[in-house]
């Protein structure tokens, strides 16, 4: 058993002081939480430094904090930023560790059973272990996570109870330690020394923790006593330092004792018997036979090996939970008084709310057709009301908060952050008639091209985007389109080429809202702005308008024959913010300047060595994949996988995620 250190302080390191609207937002939100308010909103316009505000609130409250993001890429960006702000504290990353995941499913219409298939990213698995071990060891922890944090993870009490606490001078037999390491899922391998393994050389045991990839723990025995504990470089064996005490956390989050396993097997067998009676009474003989055969095989594997493929479907029995009870998740590893901050809450909260129903629909089919026991339904993400039970303090962060947040938070508990430290204003907005819109747009594009600036155009359909691209090309304009049919890595290349000036106009649908940051864009044209719907709703329009707020000449033109309620709300909100920003700039004599953002290197189609980095090589977008031989395709995938792992190791999760998505697309083409 280990004791958690509870007196550490968050140490915010930054060359900047809060500026613009940041000081009042930080003070208001901190005071609100200290007064006992449970839910608040940080309504921050694009580019106002919301992450820095969040960091100051974390430092002020000094409580473990969970930052929720709606995808791995944005989680990776946040992780990098918080690591810079809190270099002396534990900033951790917790997302799904699957590079590829095909869930188990059954399609009755074609009688097709799809077996679970997955590939685990070892680097992300290491970071997940690092997050849970940090939460049990100390209080100054920030975990940046995706919605993976509301999926089942294993009982934190069992996980904590299985931690091995080793001290210098402790009396323990070497073989007893080896057995204990095996009990917590470490593998003995004296040759291939990796995470989650240990090796033995006489009276010396070396343990490679699951949460590390560089340092191992060397335990030296003198008889039945631990003589010395040292931290060593896992590759060279060089001693890093000596330790009086070390805690070895289990190599898996899903810890089960022998007693629990035997109890679970009995419980599974009893449920099987009951479910077989139900199926046979409904004359579902094929389903009953299938369920009996599959479940008995799983029980036998658990008896003999302590494990079976798909063991997570029996998690309710393993944990000793009652039917319908929520699973243990990452949230259970936090102490009760932790903070939650939800980034881009207008997207993240609907995602959290929708996870349960999507998972349930797929698994219900497996239960109905005899592939799984009903208890498999309890291996699931949290329902929204179960998530809410974990909330002690929660901050929703968004430029456009959603109805869920706005319904729960009084107006007085919303802190606005509108002023940008850079002085940049929200863009001017004009509404122009649809008649003659393309000719008008061509004239506006030419003005931007002459000024070496870029243009975004948003349409409603892929066909419209492609047709408009062809028309503008015929007019001599350098233009590309971007929509969901474009491969992941090609999208990154297209954005890079736009910034480099290889073309001037990018046409898209809804990919131009969150996550695309191009300071060179000074004009956004919104076609069919008066067509009410998801893509032209108030929140979507405000997010799209925000893409032009990085440039001092930012402007938005909406082409419409009437001003809809959504348009009016978006225009009024943008004008309100712009008025506040202009007044602030006047009072403080600030001149807005376009953000200067470096253009990152393209992802190449091969793994560069130190010797050939200077040589010109093809980028992935230039590779003609269709004409490659099967062997060349395999080599390309292998090279991209190496780059992905290297990017993850450097904590460049945005790059790693792009590479992962490309590998999956290429593998799908190969099959």
Curated annotation (Swiss-Prot):
Chief place of localization: cytoplasm
Keyword Transport: no
Subcellular location: Cytoplasm
Motif Beta-hairpin boundaries: 97-120
Occurrences of domain Helicase ATP-binding (ranges): 31-189
GO BP field: nucleotide-excision repair; SOS response
Residues in the signal sequence: none
PROSITE patterns named among the record's database cross-references: HELICASE_ATP_BIND_1, HELICASE_CTER, UVR
CDD domains: DEXHc_UvrB, SF2_C_UvrB
GO molecular function: ATP binding; ATP hydrolysis activity; DNA binding; excinuclease ABC activity; helicase activity
Pfam families: Helicase_C, ResIII, UVR, UvrB, UvrB_inter
Domain Helicase C-terminal residue range list: 437-599
Residues involved in ATP binding: 44-51
A single Gene Ontology CC term: cytoplasm
Domain UVR as annotated: residue spans: 634-669
Keywords for this protein: ATP-binding, Cytoplasm, DNA damage, DNA excision, DNA repair, Excision nuclease, Helicase, Hydrolase, Nucleotide-binding, SOS response
PANTHER family attached to this UniProt entry: UVRABC SYSTEM PROTEIN B
Family label: Belongs to the UvrB family.
Subunit structure: Forms a heterotetramer with UvrA during the search for lesions. Interacts with UvrC in an incision complex.
Domain comment, as recorded: The beta-hairpin motif is involved in DNA binding.
Known function: The UvrABC repair system catalyzes the recognition and processing of DNA lesions. A damage recognition complex composed of 2 UvrA and 2 UvrB subunits scans DNA for abnormalities. Upon binding of the UvrA(2)B(2) complex to a putative damaged site, the DNA wraps around one UvrB monomer. DNA wrap is dependent on ATP binding by UvrB and probably causes local melting of the DNA helix, facilitating insertion of UvrB beta-hairpin between the DNA strands. Then UvrB probes one DNA strand for the presence of a lesion.
NCBIfam families named in the record: PRK05298.1, uvrb
Protein name: UvrABC system protein B
């Amino acid at each position: 058993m280990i004791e958690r250190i509870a007196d550490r302080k968050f140490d915010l390191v930054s060359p900047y002081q809060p500026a613009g609207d940041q000081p009042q937002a930080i003070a208001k939100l901190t005071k609100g939480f200290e007064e006992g308010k449970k839910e608040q909103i940080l309504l921050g316009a694009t580019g106002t430094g919301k992450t820095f505000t969040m960091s100051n609130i974390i430092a002020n409250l000094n409580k473990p904090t969970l930052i929720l993001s709606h995808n791995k890429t944005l989680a990776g960006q946040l992780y990098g930023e918080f690591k810079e702000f809190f270099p002396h504290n534990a900033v951790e990353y917790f997302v799904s560790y699957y590079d590829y995941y095909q869930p188990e499913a059954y399609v009755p219409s074609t009688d097709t059973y799809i077996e679970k298939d997955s590939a685990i990213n070892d680097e992300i698995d290491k970071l997940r272990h690092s997050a849970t071990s940090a939460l049990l060891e100390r209080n100054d922890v920030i975990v940046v996570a995706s919605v993976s944090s509301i999926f089942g993870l294993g009982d934190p009490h069992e996980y904590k109870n299985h931690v091995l606490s080793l001290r210098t001078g402790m009396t323990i037999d070497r073989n007893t330690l080896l057995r204990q390491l095996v009990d917590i899922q470490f593998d003995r391998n004296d040759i291939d020394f990796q995470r989650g393994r240990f090796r033995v050389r006489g009276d010396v045991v070396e343990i490679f923790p699951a949460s590390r990839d560089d340092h191992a723990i060397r335990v030296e025995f003198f008889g039945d006593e631990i003589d010395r504990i040292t931290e060593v470089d896992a590759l060279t064996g060089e001693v890093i330092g000596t330790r009086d005490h070390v805690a070895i956390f289990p190599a898996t989050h899903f810890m089960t004792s022998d007693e629990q396993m035997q109890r679970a097997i009995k419980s599974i067998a009893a449920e099987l018997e009951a479910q077989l009676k139900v199926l046979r009474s409904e004359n579902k003989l094929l389903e009953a036979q299938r369920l009996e055969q599959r479940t008995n095989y799983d029980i036998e594997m658990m008896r003999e090996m302590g494990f079976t493929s798909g063991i997570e479907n029996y998690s309710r029995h393993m944990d000793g939970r009652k039917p319908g009870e929520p699973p243990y998740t990452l949230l259970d590893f936090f102490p009760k008084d932790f903070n939650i901050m939800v980034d881009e809450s207008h997207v993240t909260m609907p995602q959290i709310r929708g996870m349960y129903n999507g998972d349930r629909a797929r698994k219900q089919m497996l239960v109905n057709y005899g592939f799984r026991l009903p208890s498999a339904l309890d291996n699931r993400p949290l329902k929204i009301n179960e998530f809410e039970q974990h909330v002690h303090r929660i901050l929703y962060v968004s430029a456009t908060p959603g109805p869920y947040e706005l319904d729960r938070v009084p107006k007085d508990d919303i802190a606005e952050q509108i002023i940008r430290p850079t002085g940049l204003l929200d863009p001017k907005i004009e509404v122009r008639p649809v008649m003659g819109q393309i000719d008008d747009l061509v004239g506006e594009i030419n003005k931007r091209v002459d000024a070496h600036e870029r243009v975004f155009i948003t349409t409603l359909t892929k066909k419209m985007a492609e047709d408009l691209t062809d028309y503008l090309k015929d007019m001599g304009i350098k233009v590309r389109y971007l929509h969901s049919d474009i491969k992941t890595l090609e999208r990154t290349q297209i954005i890079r080429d736009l910034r480099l000036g290889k073309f001037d106009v990018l046409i898209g649908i809804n990919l131009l809202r969150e996550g695309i940051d191009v300071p060179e864009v000074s004009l956004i044209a919104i076609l069919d702005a008066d067509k009410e719907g998801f893509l032209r709703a108030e929140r979507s329009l405000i997010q799209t308008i925000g893409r032009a707020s990085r440039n001092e000449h930012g402007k938005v033109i909406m082409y419409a024959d009437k001003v809809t309620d959504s348009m009016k709300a978006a225009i009024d909100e943008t004008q309100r913010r712009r008025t506040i920003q202009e007044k602030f700039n006047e009072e403080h004599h600030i001149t807005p300047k376009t953000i200067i953002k470096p253009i990152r290197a393209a992802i190449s189609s091969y793994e560069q060595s130190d010797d050939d980095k200077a040589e010109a090589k093809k980028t992935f977008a230039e590779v003609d994949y269709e004409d490659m031989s099967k062997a060349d395709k395999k080599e390309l995938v292998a090279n991209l996988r190496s780059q992905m792992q290297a990017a993850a190791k450097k904590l460049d999760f945005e790059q790693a995620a792009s590479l992962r998505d490309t590998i999956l697309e290429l593998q799908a083409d190969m099959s």
